[in-house]
Amino acid sequence: MTTTTTFKGVDPNSRNSSRVLRPPGGGSNFSLGFDEPTEQPVRKNKMASNIFGTPEENQASWAKSAGAKSSGGREDLESSGLQRRNSSEASSGDFLDLKGEGDIHENVDTDLPGSLGQSEEKPVPAAPVPSPVAPAPVPSRRNPPGGKSSLVLG
């Protein structure tokens, strides 16, 4: 007499079958051809990661209000924010004179020691410092951030 094995499906109590694969996490990936309303987790920024903490904790200096001043790392935060702004402007092709922005940040930093009453320090010259990020030349064709595009436009 011949024995026939029956296929049981995704029943958790059945024996493991090589025909049915369950996704990690134990859910079922069985579909009858129509989309069931499943709730996707909503993330504000798909590039955000919880490695660095929540986005509210790690706001850039340009996102902070002008009245809130941190104690020590304000200059570093402002320079990193300025570099991010420079890189976004370089990718868009719209170049602005960044020396004026650098002067504004320097004036804010040079006014702080005078307001604290430390007259022992030497006065800092207000000479403009060249920006560390030089604007890149505008390419004749733009490629997407990931590499080359197969789309040819003239």
Swiss-Prot record:
Polar residues: compositionally biased ranges: 1-19, 47-59, 80-91
Organism, as annotated: Homo sapiens (Human)
Positions where Phosphoserine occurs in the chain: S28, S31, S71, S80, S87, S88, S92, S131
Record PTM N-acetylmethionine, positions in chain: M1
Region of interest (Disordered), residue spans: 1-154
Reported induction: Induced by EGF growth factor at mRNA and protein levels. Induced by androgens. Negatively regulated by the microRNA miR-132.
Gene that this polypeptide is encoded by: JPT1
Protein role: Modulates negatively AKT-mediated GSK3B signaling. Induces CTNNB1 'Ser-33' phosphorylation and degradation through the suppression of the inhibitory 'Ser-9' phosphorylation of GSK3B, which represses the function of the APC:CTNNB1:GSK3B complex and the interaction with CDH1/E-cadherin in adherent junctions. Plays a role in the regulation of cell cycle and cell adhesion. Has an inhibitory role on AR-signaling pathway through the induction of receptor proteasomal degradation.
GO cellular component, one term: cytosol
Family the entry assigns: Belongs to the JUPITER family.
Biased composition (Low complexity): 60-71
Kinase as UniProt keyword: no
Positions carrying N-acetylthreonine: T2
Skewed-composition ranges (Pro residues): 125-138
Listed name of the protein: Jupiter microtubule associated homolog 1
Main location: nucleus
Segments of skewed composition (Basic and acidic residues): 96-108
Lineage: Eukaryota, Metazoa, Chordata, Craniata, Vertebrata
N6-acetyllysine PTM positions: K148
Residue list for modification Phosphothreonine: T54
Known tissue expression: Expressed in testis, skeletal muscle, thymus, prostate, colon, peripheral blood cells, brain and placenta.
UniProt keyword annotations, A-Z: Acetylation, Cytoplasm, Nucleus, Phosphoprotein
Subunit structure: Interacts with the complex composed, at least, of APC, CTNNB1 and GSK3B; the interaction takes place with the inactive form of GSK3B (phosphorylated at 'Ser-9').
Record's subcellular location: Nucleus; Cytoplasm
